Amino acid sequence: MSCLPALDKFLQNYHQAYLTSLGELPRYYPQGEASVCIQGEFHADLDQAVSWQPVKREVEGSFANVEHALELTLWPEINHFYGQYFSAPLLFDSEWGTGELLQVWNEDDFTCLQQNLIGHLMMKKKLKQPPTWFIGLLDEGDKMLTINNSDGSVWIELPGEIPTQQLSPSLAEFIGALSPRIAPPVKHEELPMPALEHPGIFASFKRMWQNLFGKR
């Protein structure tokens, strides 16, 4: 079962929750990066939050280059989850705690995602661990949310370790169990990255990379 209907519904509920509770669209710190998601004026030189809404991509994002580079077939849900929309990260509440789903802010952000996905999968191979790919963060970024690439199940993963706690048998069911979390925009601290630097999708994910590479 594709996760796309669940993602579509969550995005609709997400923006409706902000409009109902705050009377405004959600806001996000783009840190100088333009996006078709931005509503209203945008000044790249001003460090301020912008109102945004998701925009369906005209051409679906592809991970064929990642698969070719790693000689690995990725679980097809990755195309539905990351390749359909431009969007800011999505905050959520759940029975497992608070967290955020990563999304792609613009085309450069998508390239950054691919580069860091390659880095993550190469690290899993180096550690002789089964391949996973990340979809978000849990508990203020202390834990990664990852997909088991062999069956599409959703797990909690700590940097450098094999996932031990399964949350859902599928990404669709996992997204369906989440509730939008209403919160003010937070400007994330910039931390060093092992691959391409980009302030969009990995503003918060950088904390995970710092922990991972600090251990090795």
From Swiss-Prot:
The keyword Cytoplasm does not apply. GO terms for cellular component: cytoplasmic side of plasma membrane. The keyword Glycoprotein does not apply. It comes from the Bacteria. It is a peripheral membrane protein. Pfam families: Syd. Keywords: Cell inner membrane, Cell membrane, Membrane. Transmembrane segments: none annotated. InterPro entries: Syd (IPR009948), Syd_sf (IPR038228). It is found in: Cell inner membrane. Interacts with the SecY protein in vivo. May bind preferentially to an uncomplexed state of SecY, thus functioning either as a chelating agent for excess SecY in the cell or as a regulatory factor that negatively controls the translocase function. Belongs to the Syd family. This is Protein Syd. It comes from Shewanella baltica (strain OS223). The gene is syd.
